Amino acid sequence: KRQALHCVDNEGEVDLEGNLKISWKYTGIELAKSIMSKPIKEIGKKVIEPMILHQNKYETDKRLREAYEEFKKLPLTTICKIARVKTFNKYSDGSSGFQTMKGMQAHVRAAYYHNLIIEKEKIHGVQPIREGDTIQVIALKPNNKYRIDSIAIRDGYMPPEFLELFEIDYRRIFEKPFYACIASLYKVANWTPPNVTDEYEFELFDLFGEE
């Protein structure tokens, strides 16, 4: 079940002023999951909640573009997908170099690439990712010498060597899961979502600006 509910009467629950407590409940959609950071969820709510209340496509499109502008200004580690590596040992043991084991999930593959790259590039001071770790998954443009399209980091630390080796694909980071979540609600409303990533270009200063 995927839904966003606007609850205007939660079994008579009231606020401090005695008014009925109005709340929102998200089930199944990305805003209800741990794959998104809290700042990203808050940006998403600024689009979704007025969308449901007012059902105005023009205003929703405007808010989605504003959300994109906010998104671009957040630190890299805030905007990336969050995941926990639960099957790392099984799939890393079954892989050899860049030939990864069939059935390996994308976030596990990104974690595996992290360890492989720090070994191949002899990057010191960066701990390998292990089974059970929580990671951030970074989308990459595949025009790098290793031809990989994602890599994971741990504890929010992006090694400078990674930035020299890889070009980060911010458009893909925005499109999934954030934009995909909003677009699914556009589909329910029978609207066509604006392609905001084609209308604007990322500014590197914003993306690597101060946290």
How does the language model describe each region?
Residues 1-211:
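DNA-dependent DNA polymerase catalytic subunits
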